[in-house]
Regions:
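A conserved glycine-rich beta-strand in the N-terminal activation segment of trypsin-fold
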Residues: 34-59, 175, 197-198
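Boundary at the C-terminal end of the N-terminal hydrophobic targeting segment
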Residues: 16-18
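Catalytic-histidine neighborhood of serine endopeptidases
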Residues: 43-45, 51-98, 190
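Envelope-exposed proteins and targeting segments
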Residues: 44-46, 52, 70, 99-104, ...
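C-terminal cap/linker of serine protease catalytic domains
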Residues: 71-72, 82-89, 114-115, 185-236
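Sec-dependent N-terminal signal peptides
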Residues: 4-13
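Flexible, gly/ser-rich surface segments that form the specificity/activation loops bordering the active-site cleft
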Residues: 95, 114-174, 188-198
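Terminal peptide-recognition signature
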Residues: 48, 54, 58, 106, ...
């Protein structure tokens, strides 16, 4: 998937992932499941949306250290399953114009089938009530959580690629699903530093540049097609 999306960015707050230093290092086992080796790593929490039984879209923040990753895993039934970074970008493309991209595509082994949702290829309008579904890193049970929110006007990003929400998102919600009427219409990626009660998300229209050709849904249950994603980066 060699697609590019160019977005205009302002200064954002710390991305919606959390880090923790743990004495484990994940490596890929023959089964695709994760084994552990003794090593200090930094664990980065985020959320991803499965749009195909083998593919997940998340943010470049979650996979931003892809060149240095010890491993990146998807939590399936409370078990870590090793994934491969198919595409990842969290970088400024043009400093003068502040053009920026923050998207990642992950792939799991073909022997593993994810619950995938359809991501609607449409713009999102100001005033729409929506639901956020993701994984808070403080939730030790690895269960998805949902919050109601509303799309609000904001001049930070140009529509229709980017929209704003009337709430600040918790850690672990980078890559959370935005839905309305039970359909995924976007994905969160960051909080604003200009407004403490504003966060941002990509519309389904923006995500379609990465997901449309491979979007093959298997479920309509958004809680089932969102997964916690964990990146492991060597601490030293």
């Amino acid at each position: 998937m060699k697609h590019t999306i160019i977005l205009i960015i302002c200064i954002l707050a710390t991305a919606l992932f959390a880090t923790e230093t743990v004495p484990t290092y994940l490596t890929e086992a023959d089964s695709g499941k994760a084994d552990t080796v003794n090593m200090d790593v930094t664990k980065v929490y985020g959320t991803g949306i499965a749009f195909n039984k083998h593919y997940i879209v998340t943010t470049g923040d979650v996979a931003r250290h892809s060149k240095k990753l010890a491993a990146i895993v998807v939590m399936i039934n409370n078990e870590p399953v090793v994934a491969r970074v198919e595409y990842s970008a969290d970088t400024v493309l043009n400093k003068d114009k502040n053009e920026y991209v923050n998207v990642a595509i992950l792939q799991v082994d073909n022997s593993i089938s994810l619950n995938a949702c359809k991501i609607e290829d449409r713009v999102v309008n100001v005033g729409e009530p929506v639901t956020l579904t993701g994984f808070n890193e403080l939730n030790t049970k690895v269960q998805s959580q949902s919050f109601p929110a509303k799309v609000v006007a904001d001049s930070t990003f140009p529509e229709p690629a980017i929209n704003a929400l009337n709430m600040r998102l918790p850690g672990g919600f980078s890559g959370a699903a935005i839905s309305r009427h039970g359909k995924v219409i976007g994905m969160t990626f960051g909080n604003s530093t200009r407004n403490a009660n504003t966060s941002f998300f990509y519309s389904g229209f923006a995500l379609s540049k990465f997901t449309l050709q491979q979007n093959k849904p298997t479920t309509t249950d958004i809680a089932k097609c969102t997964y916690q994603v964990r990146s492991y980066v060597p601490a030293k």
